[in-house]
């Protein structure tokens, strides 16, 4: 075996990293081609391609000038105790976000009856939350890119906690309208927890971990319904609002442990802070730090909207905006439709719908019954199989095909509701539809942080989240107002929107499956080191992979 070993001994030095990218010495950048002479090995070697994230053999290392990037360190340290703690902490933020969203479908019918609100005011109460989220999502993304992921997330959570508790003491409709809007403004920053979380995850674990963090969303929605079952009959909606803020309070107490992203620190020039964070992770995980010197990435302007519309990202950004719009439009529409359809009973009976319209026009109302809560709980439990299905297919089909499949299944279930079905079949169809639309949402949360570079990752996720809130803003007027006029038209709108979103998913120019996170907006996607042998020479080139 000893005679098979060989060494690289040709300058300029080619350093192989786990990211699959190449770094060349500045003396020979003009030629674009770098030869590596291999001593003692015959000519005619076949091309060898190093996969992204592949470990580099020690015999290829440069013993005199070892360097590494944050991506290398994260891959070397791996997944361990630190990431488990981070999962729980960011999961609390997600759980709180889910509870604040789920409470809308419970609070709306309650206030409709208690305060004798017309349908448009009930819809407005839901929409104002999404107005706040829409107006703040880009702002929180910009703050996270400019001042750090931890800073943006902490401020948004504390903001939501403060106004969430205040809204429980609202004396009249106008007060709760304003306060819930301010709650929505704070919730707009909670998705930045995904940005922070993703930047600490090794490549092989990233998709699975981001999907598993979505389990906390499912737990939040289920917990909110269970909480409502016990709290609403005895204590009322004000106590429900107060108790729903408990996960936010826990996050506020525990967030002192939360570190800043090492990727952000390097990009902003804080090399020492980044190294300290990486050493902390290595210590907690019981893994060694990479040897050598941490490379400081070229400092770039961060959080600039124009960077989302460079030729490389323009179509990705526009298509993602529509995908996120459709996800939220359909997901929250289904959440609101669930309570409306269960209260209506036979959704296929036109005469019953007319009676319901007449009743609602006279401001008659129905409180959610115990049966309504149980059916709501069953459909909410669909979040869990949604996570499991997405977890199983996302690394097999890829991110794009997973999103497309979820949209298609949701559309199919929506169309089946055109058939006259009983309550049990209605519950089953809503269960399947919600499982897959939540799965599509989860896949989008995996794809978006992966496709944007560190300099614009938070802003990219923030703008996508903002477009999602536009969809959520519109959906109450479809699910609660249009439903009174036509059940079929309402279902057709949701089904058609998701079919278009499925097409948009297929046309995304970049597939991020198996890719490392991009550090710089000046690097092309899919750069790989390829060793080519011809006539006794190995040639290493940096090739830009095509956009799939």
From Swiss-Prot:
Region described as Disordered: 528-548
Molecular functions per Gene Ontology: transmembrane transporter activity
Membrane side Cytoplasmic: residue ranges: 1-87, 144-156, 202-209, 260-316, 395-401, 447-457, 511-548
Compartments, record wording: Cytoplasmic vesicle, Secretory vesicle, Synaptic vesicle membrane
Vesicular face residues: 109-122, 178-180, 231-238, 338-373, 423-425, 479-489
Major place of residence: membrane
Disulphide bond pairs: none
SUPFAM superfamilies: MFS general substrate transporter
Matching NCBIfam families: 2A0119
Name this protein carries in UniProt: Synaptic vesicle 2-related protein
Organism of this sequence: Bos taurus (Bovine)
GN (gene name): SVOP
């Amino acid at each position: 075996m000893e005679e098979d070993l060989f060494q690289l001994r040709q300058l300029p030095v080619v350093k192989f990293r786990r990211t699959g990218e190449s770094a060349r010495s500045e003396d020979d950048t003009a030629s674009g081609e770098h030869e590596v002479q291999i001593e003692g090995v015959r000519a005619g070697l076949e091309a060898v391609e190093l996969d992204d994230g592949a470990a580099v053999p020690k015999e290829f290392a440069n013993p005199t000038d070892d360097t590494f990037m944050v991506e290398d360190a994260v891959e070397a340290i791996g997944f361990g105790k630190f990431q488990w703690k981070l999962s729980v902490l960011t999961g609390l933020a997600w759980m709180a976000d889910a509870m604040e969203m789920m409470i809308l479908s419970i609070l709306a019918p309650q206030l409709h009856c208690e305060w004798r609100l017309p349908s448009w005011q009930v819809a407005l109460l839901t929409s104002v939350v999404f107005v706040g989220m829409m107006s703040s999502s880009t702002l929180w993304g910009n703050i996270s890119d400019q001042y750090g992921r931890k800073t943006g997330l902490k401020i948004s959570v504390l903001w939501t906690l403060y106004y969430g508790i205040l809204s429980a003491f609202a004396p009249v409709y106008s007060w709760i309208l304003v306060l819930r809007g301010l709650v929505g403004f704070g919730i707009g920053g909670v998705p930045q927890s995904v940005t922070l979380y993703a930047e600490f995850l090794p490549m092989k674990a990233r998709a699975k971990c981001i999907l598993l963090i979505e389990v906390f969303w499912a737990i939040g929605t289920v917990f909110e319904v269970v909480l409502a079952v016990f709290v609403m009959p005895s204590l009322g909606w004000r106590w429900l609002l107060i108790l729903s803020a408990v996960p936010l309070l826990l996050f506020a107490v525990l967030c002192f442990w939360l570190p800043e992203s090492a990727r952000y620190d390097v990009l902003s020039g804080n090399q020492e802070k980044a190294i300290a964070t990486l050493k902390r992770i290595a210590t907690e995980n019981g893994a060694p730090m990479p040897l050598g010197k941490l490379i400081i990435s070229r400092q770039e302007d961060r959080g600039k909207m124009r960077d989302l519309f460079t030729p490389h990202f323009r179509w990705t950004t526009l298509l993602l905006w529509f995908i996120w719009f459709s996800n939220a439009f359909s997901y929250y529409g289904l959440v609101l439709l669930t309570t409306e359809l269960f209260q209506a009973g036979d959704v296929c009976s036109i005469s019953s719908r007319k009676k319901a319209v007449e009743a609602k026009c006279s401001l008659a109302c129905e409180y959610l019954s115990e049966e309504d809560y149980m059916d709501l709980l069953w459909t909410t439990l669909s979040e869990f199989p949604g996570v499991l299905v997405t977890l199983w297919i996302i690394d097999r089909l890829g991110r794009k095909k997973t999103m497309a499949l979820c949209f298609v299944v949701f559309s199919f279930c929506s169309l089946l509701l055109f058939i006259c079905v009983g309550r049990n079949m209605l519950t089953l169809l809503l269960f399947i539809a919600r499982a897959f639309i939540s799965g599509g949402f989860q896949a989008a949360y995996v794809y978006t942080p992966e496709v944007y570079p560190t300099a614009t990752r938070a802003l990219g996720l923030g703008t996508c989240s903002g477009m999602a809130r536009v969809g959520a803003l519109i959906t109450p007027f479809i699910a609660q107002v249009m439903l009174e006029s036509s059940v079929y038209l309402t279902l057709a709108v949701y089904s058609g929107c998701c079919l278009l979103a499925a097409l948009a998913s297929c046309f995304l120019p970049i597939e991020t499956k198996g890719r490392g996170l991009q550090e710089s907006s000046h690097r092309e996607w899919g750069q790989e080191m390829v060793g080519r042998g011809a006539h006794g020479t190995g040639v290493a080139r940096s090739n830009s992979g095509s956009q799939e």
